[in-house]
Amino acid sequence: MTHDNRQLLPQETKLVTPNKDTLSSRYLHVLIIDNTLSTIEFVYMVVKAVLTQADTLKAFEQRKNRPTNRILGLSTSVSKRYINIPKFSSSGANNSQGVKTLAAIRKFSLPDKNCFRNFLSFSTTLFKVPASIDIYFLFFTASTVSTMAARALDLEFILSSLKNSTSPESLLAATAKIEILSLAADSVTHNRVIAFINRLPPKKYHFDLIREYTVFYFLNSTTLTSENKLLSAELLHEELSQIRSSSSPGTELENLNNAEVLYVFDRILNSIKMLKNELSSPIGKLRVQPAANDPGTDKTIKYSKIQSIIQKVHSFTRENSLLANCRAVVELIDDLYRKLYSWFLHILTFEDIQFPGDTFLDRLLKMDYCFTYYPSSNRHLIDLFEKTLDNQTSTDIDKFFDTSGNSPELLYQKTFSLKIFSKNLTAQDNGLYIYPLLKTDLSILDFLGTENILFHRGLIYHILHQKTIPQERENDLNKINQFFATVIQQVIETRSSCLPASLSRLLDTIFHFNRIGLNIETCRIYVEILSNHMATPDTQPIINTFTINLIHIVFTAHVFFICMENFSPTFLFYNRKKLILEQQRAILIIERNEYSTLWKQISDHIDCLFNISLSESFFKEYTKGGNEEHKQFLYKNLFEKWGDVFFPFTYSVTTSKNSTAHHITTLELRAICKEVYQSDSPEAYESLLPYSTHPAFKTLFIKIYVIPMVTYITNLTFDKLQSDYRLITLIHACKLLLPSQHLLLHYMVWLYAFSINVDHIDLGTFTVIKSVIFKIADHINVMTHTIYSPETNLLVSILLNAYTDYLQKYVNPWIKQTITANFSLLQTYITFTKQCASILATKCNINLDNLFISMTIGTDKIVTTSFCSFIATCRNLVRQHEEFKKSLKTIETSKTTLTNMLLNIITSVSSSKELLTNEALQKFIDTVQRISQHVNETYQLISVNLEKCKISNDILIESLKKTISIVDVLSSDAILNTSLTSRCLEAATLAVSNNSFTILEIKKDAVAVFKPFITQLFESMKPTTSLYKKLMATQKLTTDRIPFLDIFDDRYNLVRHVERQLNWYAAYAEAAQQDLIAPLTF
């Protein structure tokens, strides 16, 4: 038995004797491909490192083992904030250069180009790609913002700082800090409050309001720093209760006087304690032992209990609304709503989402869902799950499962499949068992309700990754699309008018989403699936409709649950919601820029669902009895907290009695403002107060003081902004000198609060802060009638940090997963190609006495195996070849996904046109473009070499298919389906028509290269006596088995020397052969 070697590439190598028609050149291609892929793998890993700040040392160390003959000496030290490269031994760079590099990296600026000269000299050769300093900008400057705890002020520290400064302006600056940053509750004591009040001079600024409404002021400006907020609030109440008598009688603000505020605050504390006790009620256990005679009773009791709690919380919020903007009270309300949300989730049971039309599989999936995500209220499902499986008689469970592979979509339900086979809802997959997995193709819809498909993530994954749907299943997908459309219309679609947020409606929405299989955890899984999915132009329209509807539902639910986790009817949530929407918008739009219209629908719905605001009627009740100064202060305070104008409020600006400088000229005032700006004293602005009513003061102060300060601030990087004092100085100056510009002041305060309280920067926070900075610029332009543009360094540094965060959270996981999968696949394919090339070098001879095949290369015997094992190996190789043809398509998909991710980054960054002039941002864009180019080149190289592998493998596979077809002619199935006579006749025809081929001469030293691959291949096919892991499924016996074994089976014993058998006609002559075949030729 031989192979046709004449189609091999005409290439000479040192492994083979010179010959125009050489076999081993094909194998050499395998070696070349392996070496090329090792370089490709390294470049790919470097791309990953650039994108994700990964430890490049691993890439370098792996590279050492590759056939490049280069050993590099790099430091092993890597920190979270920068890459530590103290020396470059290959190029002779000294330690001082490394220190210089680290210093530059720490400062988040582009390091001195000279620092990288030597590094680039060897990295160019190593990377095998054109290198430049710019390409490493992203890699060496990417950093994350350190988490900073919120800075609450200590009242004792403020008092000590005022000992040497008793001017009204110093006290105004102190109150500004308190109102911006808040006081730590544990620092607020009766004695300190009295000491602070006693320092306030009468008839100055809003000091009289603080003196008269002391309890309200400190409750309004105090944050609960303890983890036990209720205890912290009780201690605060105890301290504030002692200063009741210190306020003057006959105060004007009826609802904010000390006695009234203390009374309401005490009522709030008692109500919260009562509600928290009720929220500890174990009503989720009501379904553990359902009443046999009335299965609906427990559900009714539970529903009534939920409605009772909702009504009490609603009443609590309404009754205490006048203090619901005091920071200490707001934090208590916020904490209560978090507790309520957690409580509601932990009372959700399987019975709540079970419906009469559910199929057997629906019920199993819902049991698993409820027990996985809400175990505390679903412990009873452990027994119910087992009983349900034991009592099932009408459904053949075997039809649910797939035994043919381990594709990605199958793995989404892997643990669930184990739970079914073990009949154990608590089972976990530890790799100890082999079992079939739940089907993910559309055939599973025969057992799964359309409205429950989101409980089956594997099915969703499968549909997303199809280009076409079989015609017989299009009706199923149409039903799914109709169901999605119904969900969008009934649960998601925005109403024509937005009512105030209703707790009852929000909890109903939680229930509806859980009913179809969506909670915050499953939404995150689906967001990840959708983020990694990339539709192609040739995708069938019905699948595109499915994808758009799915994205609409999943992203709406995802944003809803994030908002719900943070919800409370307070200004805290109102500001959180802005940030959440910007963060999620950035994620969706950067993944798919064409989804911007879809995002508007999602955000409109979320805004409508979580609609909270302040009304003018509330403000009138809030300020009842107050004078204009009171109302002005309270309005500005509310605006600073909420950040929006919900209703107009007009007030007059009182003239300060200190303002006595109308007679100075504009030039003199300009000089004074300039001197103040250039002063080293942070409080120098206080000297401008006497001039604040001069007709030209506002314009001059903005131009000479505010604009240069804003320019300086926006020219900082974000980490420098966090430690710089000038922004808070600017806020104090504007609060003192421009009291009527509350919008400008609000945005400055917001920027400052953001800079000190931010946990991390992402694309959402960048969008918000960009908006704030340009709103500051817009207000400056309106006041000065000029065109002012802020500097871009601050926004660019935030943007780069934001994209670092995006790359780490979304691109990095995808790359990590893809690299693992792709390179595992490539390595397997290379091994397969080497095996195929090795077999092509052999000559196969069959021994008809014992049906054994010996494989040789030249005169060297390589391996001997049974005919049965040989054919099984051939079949296995053909099967692997077909599987590789399918699986290798994922590499092209990976390329498309990654390049689109990078392209979307470039598109998104370029959309910030105001920042494009910034050099650092241009370097960032250039870097991503270069990375994208190198990714394309790398994938192109992979594609070219894979095609060469395929050509090589196709030669062998075609030969093996011919061999298998000869065997299949005489297979038991063929004989059973036709007749023995016709099979023998066809076999004879094939045998006669088969041609032999010329055997090429192979050099002796090639045998050692080929032999291991052939030996390994056929050793793995030897029968073994080891015990296989038993399938947990019971295999049903069938009666339609073939009544005889395959004629090539090893269990048939051939009779040797048949000519010696009695009365047996045997001869080797042509006549004898003709005698045997003639009756079959008709």
Curated annotation (Swiss-Prot):
Compartment(s) where it occurs, according to its Swiss-Prot or TrEMBL record: Virion tegument; Host cytoplasm; Host nucleus; Host Golgi apparatus, Host trans-Golgi network
InterPro entries, sorted: Herpes_U30, HSV_ITP
Keyword Cell inner membrane: no
Pfam annotation, one family: Herpes_U30
Region (Interaction with large tegument protein): 604-1082
Keyword check for NAD: no
A Gene Ontology biological process term: virion assembly
Subunit architecture: Interacts (via C-terminus) with the large tegument protein/LTP (via N-terminus).
The protein, known as: Inner tegument protein
Lineage: Viruses, Duplodnaviria, Heunggongvirae, Peploviricota, Herviviricetes
